[in-house]
């Protein structure tokens, strides 16, 4: 596990596996695609993926508390991920994750930094206006209410409200961050448990809809 430090280190986990279907036939989210994307970025920029994201995303968006930190070199105020055991006790997730995140996820960040990310992205400080539009374009329909853009989930909440969101989880950590374009509202929930973020996001979203904050 601790030998997984660069995108190339993840290749043996999937490179010899049989494809699920022909490319373009249907949609199936998979982390392996983001590992390959990280390798492309490294090839084009001649930089380690984590360094490129730090310089071109975190720094430009002024996400000063975020980074690809090693599990054995975390900032002092980092919330440690926890996994619940079958008997109801808890253990840390230090032996359940790679030593450092990869191009499929694993960065450390704060809710305030995620707001800076959304604002920077939506004001075209990170990408051009046309590229940003492609990011949020529904390139594939997932079900009756959800589509997928370029790395972003697009969900229709009701006839007049939608949200653009990113999410993820690993052992001992869960994350959900959404932008509601009708009101320009941002909601970010981070949890140091595997499923702690989802229920809270649902509750906040329901409250927003009931109170009419989106309108």
Question: Which residues make up each language-model segment?
Answer:
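Short, small/polar residue-rich loop motifs at catalytic or cofactor-binding pockets
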Residues: 172-173
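Short, gly/Ser/Thr-rich active-site loops of penicillin-recognizing serine hydrolases
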Residues: 159-161, 194-215
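Short, surface-exposed loop or secondary-structure junction motifs
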Residues: 1-169
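Short, intrinsically disordered/low-complexity patches at protein termini
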Residues: 73-77, 188-189, 198, 210-213
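Short, well-ordered beta-strand elements
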Residues: 176-179, 183-193
């Amino acid at each position: 596990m601790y030998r997984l430090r660069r995108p190339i280190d993840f290749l043996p986990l999937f490179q010899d596996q049989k494809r699920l279907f022909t490319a373009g036939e249907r949609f199936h989210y998979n982390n392996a695609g983001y590992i390959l994307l990280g390798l492309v970025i490294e090839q084009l920029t001649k930089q380690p993926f984590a360094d490129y994201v730090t310089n071109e995303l975190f720094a430009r968006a002024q996400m000063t508390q975020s980074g690809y930190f090693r599990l054995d070199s975390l900032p002092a105020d980092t919330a440690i991920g926890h996994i619940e055991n079958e008997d109801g006790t808890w253990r840390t997730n230090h032996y359940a994750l790679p030593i450092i995140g990869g191009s499929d996820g694993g960065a450390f960040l704060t809710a305030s930094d995620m707001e800076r990310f959304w604002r920077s992205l939506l004001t075209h400080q990170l990408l051009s206006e046309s590229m940003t539009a492609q990011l949020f374009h529904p390139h594939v329909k997932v079900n009756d209410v959800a589509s997928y853009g370029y790395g972003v989930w697009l969900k229709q909440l009701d006839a007049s409200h939608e949200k653009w969101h990113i999410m993820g989880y690993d052992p001992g950590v869960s994350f959900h961050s959404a932008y509601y374009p009708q009101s320009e509202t941002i909601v970010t929930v981070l949890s140091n448990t595997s499923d702690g973020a989802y229920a809270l996001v649902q509750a906040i979203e329901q409250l927003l809809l009931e109170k009419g904050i989106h309108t």
